[in-house]
Amino acid sequence: MTEPIISFKDFSFQYHSQATPTLQNINVDIYPGEKVLVVGASGSGKSTFANCINGLIPFKTKGNVTGELHINNQDATVSCLHKRSNVVGTVLQDTDGQFIGLTAAEDMAFLLENNCVEQDDMKKNVSYWAEKVDMIEHLNHRPQDLSGGQKQRVSLGGILIHRTPILILDEPLANLDPATGHETLRLLNNIHEETKSTMIIVEHRLEESLDDTFDRVLLFKDGKIIANTTPSDLLKSSKLKEAGIREPLYCTALKYAEVDVESIDNLANLREVCMSEHVKFKVKKWIDKTSSNDDNKYKSEPLLELNEVCVQYSDYSNSVLNNVQLNVYRREMLSIVGHNGAGKSTLAKAICGFLDITGNIQFCNKGFNQLSISERSEFIGYVMQNPNHMISEKMIYDEVALGLRARGMKESDIKIRVENVLKICGLYAFRNWPIAALSYGQKKRVTIASVLVLNPEIIILDEPTAGQDFYHYNEIMSFLIELNRQGKTIIMITHDMHLLSEYSSRTVVLSKGQVVADTTPVLVLNDKKICEIASLRQTSLFEMAEYIGISEPQKLIQLFINHDRKVRRQ
């Protein structure tokens, strides 16, 4: 019988800063060549599990270890980080924490340089993998000029060069646009098939990541593995709901259509599922009997107006934003989508005054260009994509209170507002914690809280749901909906097709610095050309409609959106 390449036996780990173990009594074997998906809510222990395998725990991050862990038949606790890196390659969730070089090419070549590889061979290797991860045109760019998704692809290329027998990817889709994420998963699957490496992917976005190419899924909750099973069996169980993880949209749609999902053999393969005549009949019957009128219209009063706005970085030949014309309406929830590097984050920074622009921005029919960043912050709050770019304080409470203190508010009033927002964002229990002890997703919630507490009229959130499990996703989005009902205008820059379809009244699509679409979410997701231009990926609902033979997929998509909203309101 094949020996496991990774073996946990009665394994527990507790950080020195925590009162209870983050991992509790883990017993699992992973065998050579397996492709395993690790799933769990934010703070469930899945990243800690991965870090125990790659050696960051205990060689960099200290804590109390009990039980046994063997990697490649070696006791994992007596090795060292350098030796472990020859066996385990890791793409971290926080891309800034992994970027070393001054350019993308230099970063990808880091390992080769340390191994004294000849320059000609080094260039060939870097070019080969840069082509694979679609970064060949960005090799000479500095890290600060790359989007979060582009940085992640650079890190992926640098790890793939090493060809380690074990490859770990921690939230690989977190900063990628949907189409690029899909291509990344396809690339990883091809690499897995070609190299027969052991691949562990840590992810909670099952809509994009889960399929029947995975041998197993490990589901974490509160530091324990509550499911160790096949993708199909996991989807048939109630374990995902128990762990606060959202199932793929098509599974939810099947249940709304009263399909008996437990009777489906391979539920993780959508194409096979839709070949069933029973499934086709049930879904079409659901569409025919249910009204799908869109009841979510945005207001017609402009609040923010952008006229021919352009932004150009000094070392880019082309404009990052090119003659952008855009109205943002009072009390709407607007989503802005597009491929990595399309200009989405640049647009937000231009509105907030972080970048010099040409063109004109008006707020409430008054000139906005001449206002300083501080003056604009009275009206507009901005939550950046990377939480590490925003955090200034060491403690959670102090970080959320920072803006209020800068405005001279009384400490007693600050306490009330900060604690209220911390409760809403699921952070109240951690209010006295150091920020360094938080996961990436928890840090993201801290930055959202630090802006929400200031109560601006417009809130811009760059990837608000990145790194969030379904429970905290719903908590944050429910709070944003409530703010919207109170009169706040919400702008969400996102790759999340769930968020786009479920919470947006309008969607603006950017591509190469230009607005290429400005319409409803359903029409965006139903337009193959727009999805291709903007590197969007149509959801599993659209794929379901095509497989079943529904001539107007937008009917199924709109029906699902309306029905799901009603269910969530109950």
Curated annotation (Swiss-Prot):
Any one GO molecular function term: ATP binding
Highest taxon of the lineage: Bacteria
UniProt KW keywords: ATP-binding, Cell membrane, Membrane, Nucleotide-binding, Repeat, Translocase, Transport
Keyword Chloroplast: no
Residues reported in the UniProt entry to bind ATP 1: G40, A41, S42, G43, S44, G45, K46, S47
EC top class, as a word: translocase
Presence of keyword Transport: yes
Coiled-coil portions: none
InterPro entries named among the record's database cross-references: AAA+_ATPase, ABC_Co_transporter, ABC_transporter-like_ATP-bd, ABC_transporter-like_CS, ABC_transpr_CbiO/EcfA_su, ECF_ABC_transporter_ATP-bd, P-loop_NTPase
EC number: 7.-.-.-
Pfam families according to UniProt: ABC_tran (PF00005), DUF3744 (PF12558)
Compartment annotation: Cell membrane
Domain ABC transporter stretches: 6-247, 304-537
GO CC aspect terms: ATP-binding cassette (ABC) transporter complex
SMART domains on file: AAA (SM00382)
Residues that, per the record, bind ATP 2: G338, H339, N340, G341, A342, G343, K344, S345
Protein's membrane topology: Peripheral membrane protein
Stored NCBIfam families: PRK13648.1
Similarity comment: family membership: Belongs to the ABC transporter superfamily.
Function: Probably part of an ABC transporter complex. Responsible for energy coupling to the transport system.
Name this polypeptide is given: Putative ABC transporter ATP-binding protein SAR2766
Species of provenance: Staphylococcus aureus (strain MRSA252)
